[in-house]
Amino acid sequence: MFRFQSLDDDCTLEEEEGLVEEEDEIDQFNDDTFGAGAIDDDWQEEHTRLAELDERVRDVLPGAGDSDTSHGGSNAHSSVLPPPSSSSRLYPDIDERGGGDLAESLTRLILGSDPAIAGVGSTSSDRSHLPPMLSAHPPHPSALAGPSSLLRSYQQHQQFLHRGPAPLSQINSHSIWENSMGFSPVSVNSGLIGQKEDKTLLSIIKEVGLPNRPPSLSRDEGRDLSERVPPPRSSSPVIGSPPVRAVPIGTPPKQPMSQILNQQNNHPSAIHVRASVPMRFPPPFPERLSPNNLLSIAKSPLSHSPFPAGVNPVLSQIQRAQLLNSQVGQFQRGPAPPLLQGGVGGFRPFFGQSGPRIGPHGPPLGHAPIRHNTTHLHPQHRRMLSQRMQNRGDHVGGRGVGERKNRDPYSNLMTQREKEWVAKIQMMQLQSTDPYLDDYYYQNYYEKMEKRQERDRDNRKEHTTKLITPQVAKLEHTYRPVQFAGSLGKLTVSSVNNPRKMIDAVVTSRSDDEEKREKQVWNKRRQILYTVEKMYSLLLEVQDFEKKFLQTPEHQRDVLLEQHKTHTLQLYNSLREKEWDDRVSDEQCLMIMSVRKGKRLISRLLPFLPQPQAAAVVMGIARNLPALAKKDKQDQVLCWLVEPVSVVIQSMSSTSLTDLLQELQGSEGQLPLVLQNKFGVTLLYLILSEGERMQSSDPNCQLMDDNRWTELVFSVTRELLKVPSSALSSPLFTPPNLVSLFSRYVDRQRLELLQEKLQITALSR
């Protein structure tokens, strides 16, 4: 119905229809420059002004029959110019008031509501520059009564709109684009709507009447404005990014009317359209205009358009009639769009359509969100804004679509390629023979998730979802490098991949003596191991003799006894020296006892040998004890011989005991080595303890008269007194009769020293 154009009348209908669709969002450039929290309306003052206006209008309406009263009410009305508000009723309905009053209301709304514009001139001066129809003629009392006055006032209003612009000298003083704001003047074009269409429209209004006002719909009512607050920055935080262009405040956005036309065709009873006025971009603000003045402009009532949203260029007669009523209702109740609308390609005209309106049945299906140009922003800021707009679109548009309710706010943090990369890593971790070791936390998380799903299922019989991972059979491959006889080292992977001339192996020729000596060493070791194994087989036969003897009949036991003697003799002969019958070969003894298994063999063999042969073996051990102790530092197996050797010592005669002590002392310097070994010290104490037992038990013992024994005991006593306590090894046990033995051969002072040293060794044991 109402169509406005700027002074530049070159915006054609095709250009208007070709405008790009954009969302009803705030202008990002304006918010980045001034911030979104700068609007601070004084609602108490507005509330007071609205209350005064309501009281004065009520005083005017009851006296409609009196022309003076009506005229006074009109003047009172014109003296107070409140800002438009969606919550209060500024103007009466068109059924209750005249058409002239409607025009006056429009003029007051545009020129008088804003404090910034009202400060330019007084109300009386404003009215002096207005056309005579709006300033000099108050409504007649009869205009408030019938439909004829309604049509007459409407016709006067149309004539005012089609009359053409006033001189620039008259408009300039109160132009909303001039003075301190620095905008170019805006005029109303008179050639938009013809008189023929107006006459047809008036005839339809006479016949049909004005339709009821539809309830105003706005999608901005339930919106939380806190989510529209971007960071209050005027430029991008990234150094080197393009600067933000200074675009004038108040330049409305461009928006086509395709969605509004669809809603008009689908719902003709509730049409809410706005007059779309294409306009050239006004010049920028002068440098003297501060941000505070810009904020006052943004807070002014002029920031909300008083006209309905986008008018269809070609409307039917019924739609025009409905539009007349919807305009008045929009003035009183409908909230106006925001002043600044952001979009691609700059700012849009002030009276342009601010965005598609949501109809009573929700947004049109298939409408894709339009993204703003945020290439000048920081990447992190751009991501935050895109997520905010997406979440806001889901919140508003998802009321009618159920599939958008459960949108993940973190869905845009990773790209699809990154998600696939993480999924592949998880699948590689799951291909494991021991998942609890390789991916412990994921296995526990999955078990907890399954238990939670089972609890939420309320004991319903459903198949639990199991993670099916591909079973990849792991082929155990053991790399065996190729070896060549005489080559240096092993072949490497680089040698296989990059073949080269092999290094010439230098063949070192050894002498025959070295080869013979090496063969002898290997043969000797093989011979020792063979001898030990053969002796073990004989020892097992000897150990099983008692079982076989009890199970064998009496007439066969003699044969079994002969076999037992033969096996025992073979065991001793493997240790005996060839030239001597009662002497163990030192070399053979050392060879066998140099092996750990050989030492265990001797400890198991001693109880089965006859007493003379066992004594010979013990003497051979005592004779070669320093060498055996040196080889037994790691094995520590000689201590296993203490028990069988003590049994053999207790069965010896005094002469054999003296010979054993002499073999243990050996040559000069052997006794200190014996005292440093645990088995050697224990063996010495056993020999001395057995001699003391013989002397104390038998007064006629030959040891008292044997000078060798006495000299050996003196030698041992001197060595014990001389050796330091740290060098004396602790024995396995200390016989208690050693003190009485030493008391026979030393004085009391030395006896106390020996006793103290023996106690120390006993405590250290």
Curated annotation (Swiss-Prot):
Keywords: Cytoplasm, Nucleus, Phosphoprotein, RNA-binding. GO terms for cellular component: nuclear speck; P-body; PML body. Coiled coil: none annotated. Residues 1-98, 119-147, 210-244 are annotated as: Disordered. Residues 235-244 have a biased composition (Low complexity). The keyword Cytoplasm applies. It holds the Pfam family PAT1. It comes from the Eukaryota. One of its GO terms (molecular function) is RNA binding. Its main location: cytoplasm. Residues 7-30 have a biased composition (Acidic residues). PANTHER family: PROTEIN PAT1 HOMOLOG 1, TOPOISOMERASE II-ASSOCIATED PROTEIN PAT1. Belongs to the PAT1 family. RNA-binding protein involved in deadenylation-dependent decapping of mRNAs, leading to the degradation of mRNAs. Acts as a scaffold protein that connects deadenylation and decapping machinery. Required for cytoplasmic mRNA processing body (P-body) assembly. Interacts with ribonucleoprotein complex components. This is Protein PAT1 homolog 1. It comes from Danio rerio (Zebrafish). The gene is patl1.
